[in-house]
Amino acid sequence: MITPKVLSGFKDRLPKDAIQKAQLLAKVSVVFQSFGFVPIETPHLEYAQTLLPDASSDIQKEIYRFKDHGDRDVALRFDLTVPLARFVSLHHQILGMPFKRYAIGNVFRGERAQKGRYREFTQCDFDFIGSESLVCDAEIIQVIIASLKALDLEDFCVSINHRKILNGICEYFGIAQVNEVLRIVDKLEKIGLNGVEEELKKECDLDSNTIKDLLEMVQIKQNDLSHAEFFEKIAYLKDYNENLKKGIQDLERLYQLLGDLQISQNLYKIDFSIARGLGYYTGIVYETTLNDMKSLGSVCSGGRYDHLTKNFSKENLQGVGASIGIDRLIVALSEMQLLDERSTQAKVLIACMHEEYFSYANRLAESLRQSGIFSEVYPEAQKIKKPFSYANHKGHEFVAVIGEEEFKSETLSLKNMHSGMQLNCLSFLKALEIIGENDEDL
């Protein structure tokens, strides 16, 4: 006999969990659509050569790569952005530019499994392709904020940086291996200052003084300073080199655009330590954390990549986008008790006291569904205790009971499972009125 078990880093999703996830995905999808983003789908499995060029060395170690039955070198996608690059290169002539897309799907990374981090997880990506305008960057941040608010989250912060600022800092210190240094700096929250120092010494052969000065500069944060105060504080950096100048100027323009949108300034701050480990980012980058659950890591991250299609096409298409980590958000929302705890999406359970009443019960259920009330019929004629127990376990809000009197008069008795109140022999319209008084969760 086979012992049923699940691989580490993977998980089954029980009905309650699957319902919660579906509800969250539906909410963020509405936000994406409200900004004009359209859905696309790409395969879970790609040619390995499609995925590998833009993966950092750390990500390459985590990629699930193997030979398929045709002896082709293939891999499971580790994000949705690299497949987007392949997709846009293949279809750009019929898509029209600029192109705004969102994609929701599972991705795979063989990283160490821990709280809120899985080896298979769902990403919700939204991207603006084919424009260099910082208006696009501002809109992506606007969508991040609108999406989290749609999930009833208010206490969070989008930490913003620019890869040119990081490139400029490396240039200022004469560091040649920029991508490797930034890959390590990106681990600051994960392995701490001492861990980053050790890796920079070991892997980049930097001396202690350079590391000290480098880390001091990349830890510059806006914190409680106003936008104007912060930009005044870092203005001197624009004289160091063109990369720093361009990066800071772009952030100043971005902040002007975000200010015009009247977004609360508490929701976004500049943080020079935000690097994003993926090598394809070239411009503004950002990570979003929940202020009371920072140990969970980023729940939404992204940035600008101005060489999106360089590996697939001579025609270069730039883009900017972000990805919402829905699985991490589920962990957070669960701890905040902001999730629906029911194991059913049906609001009403219909219970019959005798086999011959099922024809009426099924007609009643269909009438409720046509009125927008999700309903199910308990499939066995039982003593009423068993259907009530079932409804309590699943989370039905109402139980409609069909006994002899209800069957003969074509009425129903209705019990509110939350309050315990029961009303007998109601007409369909009266029952519908009562059930519909609290239908916002349908």
Swiss-Prot record:
Bilayer-crossing regions: none
Catalytic activity: tRNA(His) + L-histidine + ATP = L-histidyl-tRNA(His) + AMP + diphosphate + H(+)
UniProt keyword rRNA processing, yes or no: no
EC number: 6.1.1.21
Gene Ontology terms: biological process: histidyl-tRNA aminoacylation
Assembly and interaction partners: Homodimer.
Name the record gives this protein: Histidine--tRNA ligase
Organism: Helicobacter pylori (strain J99 / ATCC 700824)
